[in-house]
Amino acid sequence: MAEDDLCSLFFKLKVEDVTSSDELARHMKNASNERKPLIEPGENQSMDIDEEGGSVGHGLLYLYVDCPTMMLCFYGGSLPYNWMQGALLTNLPPYQHDVTLDEVNRGLRQASGFFGYADPMRSAYFAAFSFPGRVIKLNEQMELTSTKGKCLTFDLYASTQLRFEPGELVRHGECKFAIG
């Protein structure tokens, strides 16, 4: 894909003009629904799981990094190392309205052991990916404390295969976590 095409695609996938967690949630649900026909086998089509190289898809998974890092990764076609063994993703949506950015940052730092999450701006930006069969679910989970003191648990996924296709990036943009 030519550099101009990549640049156009990157900006086309950016979530803009979203001001609340509810708006971002609706936007991401629509984006996920748009992707379903592209990643699910159609009627009368069989899907050989072994041939596809892994288990069935996990829906949208999120990577939390800063915007410049995401741009570099997108143009390079690879995920950043944000974990000792590759890329760490989660099913924590970027519109979780009852958890603060600081708490998300703490959870990511604890789960990944990545010193880069010491700065909250490292997790203020998200990239939503659809990796059918390309990630593994880890045995550990990320535990966060909500703004009301409730324990929230999110799954963690790993990808040691850091190359990705532009079509696997579904959306990216600023997170809409609780302010606090």
UniProtKB/Swiss-Prot annotation:
Top EC group: hydrolase
Hydrolase in keyword set: yes
Domain of life according to the entry: Bacteria
Keywords for this protein: Cytokinin biosynthesis, Glycosidase, Hydrolase, Plasmid
Keyword Metal-binding among UniProt keywords: no
Protein's GO biological process: carbohydrate metabolic process; cytokinin biosynthetic process
Protein known as: Cytokinin-beta-glucosidase
